[in-house]
């Protein structure tokens, strides 16, 4: 008999600031690796169409985001890090249930995310360029750092 949580959570895709079902409308069920009868939750079974929608929404949002002053972007990223810190224990427990990772290692993974968010927030205050002398008397070379655009990554998070 499958054991479910008091309330099985159904997770949707966050695209364009809205929680939406997958293009197919299908979901899949995730089970605890420690107990295959324990349901972790139900998740949107996404496809290439969903990925394209997400990338397009991110590209559209980037046009506004890139105009936000770097120190303000830094504050937003710092708040994200502080939220991770506030919910560290529950996030670590969720990771343990979902992946079978030992709790102390999951706590370490969440701490790495917290540390990276705080680091990135600090970098928001260092969005400056540099100038260097040029070969000609009345000229100089200038480099300015600026956001490039949407980046998609797939990271491994399997365990052990």
List where the protein language model places each region.
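Hydrophobic face of amphipathic alpha-helices that form TPR/SEL1-like repeat modules
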Residues: 1-35
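Short glycine- and Lys/Arg-enriched binding-loop motifs that mark or flank ligand-binding interfaces
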Residues: 13, 21, 96, 118, ...
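Short clusters of hydrophobic/aromatic residues that line enzyme substrate/ligand-binding pockets
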Residues: 14, 43, 131-132
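Short linear motifs in exposed loops
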Residues: 23-25, 42-43, 135
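Conserved strand-loop elements at the edges of beta-sheets that form or border functional pockets
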Residues: 32, 45, 145
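Glycine-rich loop-to-alpha-helix module at the N-terminal edge of alpha/beta enzyme cores
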Residues: 36-128, 138
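Conserved small-residue-rich beta-alpha loop and adjacent elements
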Residues: 130-160
């Amino acid at each position: 008999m499958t054991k479910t949580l008091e309330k099985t959570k159904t997770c949707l895709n966050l695209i364009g600031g809205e929680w939406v079902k997958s293009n197919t409308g299908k979901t899949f069920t995730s089970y605890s690796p420690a107990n295959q009868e324990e349901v972790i939750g139900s998740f949107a079974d996404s496809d290439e169409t969903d990925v394209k929608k997400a990338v397009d929404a991110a590209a559209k949002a980037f046009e506004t985001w890139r105009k936000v002053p770097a120190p303000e972007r830094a504050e937003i990223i710092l708040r994200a890090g502080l939220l991770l810190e506030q919910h560290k224990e529950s996030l670590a427990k969720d990771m343990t249930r979902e992946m079978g990772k030992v709790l102390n290692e999951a706590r370490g993974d969440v701490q790495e995310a917290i540390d990276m968010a705080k680091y990135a927030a600090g970098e928001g205050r260092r969005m400056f360029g540099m100038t260097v002398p040029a070969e000609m008397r009345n000229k100089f070379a200038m480099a300015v750092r600026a956001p490039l655009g949407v980046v998609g990554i797939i990271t491994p998070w399997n365990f052990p």
